[in-house]
């Protein structure tokens, strides 16, 4: 199937940047002297936890919805998401005046469900361990004439996600390595398009939770591997497989897929809070955790870390901080 896909290019990322700039935040790039000393390197953190609705997903959602025709806008959109894409679609739809229905798992963080509803999205719940959300979405969209905007496997979505890395490179210049959180691959594939444009020799790494290493398996096998829903605190990376669009780009433009443990994620979450004074959700800690694990190989290099988001329940966050 992937052989017939027309894959996005960097030009699509650049176009997305123009399309979303009126509404999307140009998020800050932070540095930490503590991290630079620990790594003996220059490390730059692109903080998408400061994006509208708290995560990079706003970029892709807004880019995709902005390109719908009038009939599609009037009928409305449908998506399925564990949280951040749900909020992103709900907020983007609200901004553009488009009705939105969102299929969310019963165990999605309450903060993400509440925010999605708060932005005006109509939430439909499902059991992620029993139900097939993509099948549900197909049935509802066909019945109601809605346009499905999937969380990651969509050319306009992944092009939008790539705008975060584009901004990072434009602000700090060439990098030797870029670490990107990996769930379904929208952020990683979009970031890889940007990295190859700005710094062709930059090593691009995707990072998954150990329990959900479908991307790593796929990368090594050369074809998409499906797994059961992984049990991990990185709720934004509980995807069961990469997408056709995302994997097609990842296998060509990414250097490797790494994994980290939940314990490493908690260590990074606590570091972000204590030393950098920022709230980062567990999934957003994937990139830094992997860079820390291989810091010996990164000495005297310029490193980019994309923090994917900061949407975490306060009670859950407090629990992680106390561990």
From Swiss-Prot:
Mg(2+) 2 binds at residues 208, 212, 214. The keyword Nucleotide-binding applies. Allosterically activated by ATP, by magnesium, and possibly also by other divalent metal cations. Its cofactor is Mg(2+); Mn(2+); Ca(2+); pyridoxal 5'-phosphate. ATP binds at residues 32-33, 52, 87, 119, 277, 311. Keywords: Allosteric enzyme, ATP-binding, Calcium, Isomerase, Lyase, Magnesium, Manganese, Metal-binding, Nucleotide-binding, Pyridoxal phosphate. It catalyses: L-serine = D-serine; L-serine = pyruvate + NH4(+); D-serine = pyruvate + NH4(+). Its EC number is 5.1.1.18, 4.3.1.18, 4.3.1.17. Pyridoxal 5'-phosphate binds at residues 84, 183-187, 308. Homodimer. Catalyzes the synthesis of D-serine from L-serine. Has dehydratase activity towards both L-serine and D-serine. This is Serine racemase. It comes from Schizosaccharomyces pombe (strain 972 / ATCC 24843) (Fission yeast).
